[in-house]
Amino acid sequence: MRATLTRAVTFSAAHRYRRPEWDDARNREVFGACAHLNWHGHTYTCEVTVGGEVDPVTGFCADLGALDRALAERVVAALDHRNLVLDVPAFAEGALIPTGENVAWWIAREVQAALGPSTRVERVRLSEMPGLWVEIVPA
């Protein structure tokens, strides 16, 4: 039997959307207020769902302690109270634009790397504010 387990964490971070090869006018046209040169921030809520076969001995589908450590060490420690563009190499200017989709994908990759192959990241849901979220399902 397979099951899933979801844990939610929060973190606060600043970012902006910008393509360095575009001028300011083009960035504003495409990204709107998210392209503001002086940044903007969110208090994100991130839900990570992992899944696996239920262990007949423990009754667990995943090691919650390992998931909590992965979220604390690979996500919250890396992103909380950070400027995503300046502090996280994956989102440096000219690399990935720190959209909700890209941040969620990055989180999925980081958590999966920490958990190893026995537990699979099934879904990441990332909310920038009430009423706005992105959900990714890693392939």
Locations of the language-model features?
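Charge-rich, low-complexity N-terminal segments
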Residues: 1-139
